[in-house]
Amino acid sequence: MVTIVWKESKGTAKSRYKARRAELIAERRSNEALARKIALKLSGCVRADKAASLGSLRCKKAEEVERKQNRIYYSKPRSEMGVTCVGRQKIKLGSKPLI
């Protein structure tokens, strides 16, 4: 009697590519985290020092938003300024206002 042994599937090219990318990203993240830790130790900064040194960011005023001056034309017509267009009904011998 013959026994058939199936090999494990290596997966598709896309899954292998994604696995390689995941390994590279994980390695890069660990390297960046280690580099940040080393830089922090070398600089001797603590969170409190960083917060105190960023006083300019705390005192920074919020930017004012520019507002449109012609807003009254687009609001509900309370006066004649609110009417921005006039409609006309065209017929064979002339045009009549829609009012």
Curated annotation (Swiss-Prot):
Entry keyword set: Transcription, Transcription regulation, Transcription termination
GO BP term, example: DNA-templated transcription termination
Described purpose of this protein according to its UniProt entry: N protein regulates the transition from the early to the middle stage of lytic development.
Further comment: Protein N is an immediate early function essential for all other phage vegetative functions.
Protein known as: Probable regulatory protein N
